[in-house]
C-alpha cells in the first residue's frame, strides 16, 4: 500500500476564538483509496497553528516512513525517520518516450546526429530504439561497459553501432541530445541543438532545452491523486512504488522549459527548423 501525506494548517484566530484554538489538538484523518487494484493510504494532518509533529504519525504511516508521497513544501527534519519519496525513473521514461515519438515523426532521420547523455550508464536499453532511426549516434557515459552488450546486439541486428565515449565534446554537432537523467554538468552543444532531459538542468547549456512533461493521467488514478501533487510526481510514485509499469509507455502531449511550452506538433516544427538551420550553417562553412 502506498502512503500519501497532506498537511492542512489553520492559523490561530485572535481573541477568545484564538484561546479555543490553543486547546484544539492536531489530528490526522486517514482515507484508504483504491484504483486499478492499487491501494493508497491518504493521511491528512490537520495542524492548528503549531509546527507539525510528524512523529505522532509513526504508527499510522508504518513501513512507508522513508517513502512518503507528498508535496515538496512539506519539510521533514534532517534526522527525521520520515523521508519524501523521490525517484526519477518514470520521468526518464517520459523523456525517452517523447524523443522516440519525435524521431518517428521525422522524414530526415537518416541525416540526424543524435547524442545520448547518460553518465551513469543506466539507460543502455534505450540505445536500439534510437538507432532504429539513425546510425549516427554518440553515447557519452562514464560507464562505457554498460553499453557493450547493447552495442553488440545493435551490430548483429542492424549492422551498425554507436560511438561510446567519455568525451562530452563529441556532442557538439548533434541535432538532438537525449539526457534521461538530470543534467548536472555542462557539455558541448550548439544553438541549433534540441535537448530533451529530465528535470531542470543544474548547468548552463547551449540550445533549446525542454525538461518538464505533461500528459493525461489514466482513468482511475486521477481520482485518488491528492489535489496538491503534480501529475508527473504522483505517477512516478505509482510507477516505482506501486509497480504500475504500464505508465512507462505514456508519451507526453506537451513539454516545457522555464519560459516556453510546446505541443508535440510545435516541438516537431521547431526541431525541423533547427535541423534546417544546422544544415544551412554546415553548407556555408
Residue ranges and their predicted role:
Residues 75-79, 123-125, 144-151, 184-187, ...:
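Short, charged/polar "capping" segments at the starts of alpha-helices
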Residues 83-101:
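A glycine-rich, Thr/Ser-enriched phosphate-binding loop motif common to dinucleotide/cofactor-binding enzymes
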Residues 8-17, 22-78, 100, 271-285:
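Metallocofactor- and cofactor-centric catalytic cores in central/energy metabolism, strongly enriched
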Residues 26-30, 45-58, 152-173, 182-186:
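A short, well-structured beta->alpha microelement
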Residues 106-170:
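Glycine-rich phosphate/diphosphate-binding loop of Rossmann-like nucleotide-binding domains
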Residues 198-285:
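Adenosine-phosphate binding glycine-rich loop
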Residues 15-23, 78-83, 128-130, 148-158:
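Short, aromatic/basic amphipathic alpha-helical patches
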Residues 161-222:
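Rossmann-like adenosine-cofactor binding region
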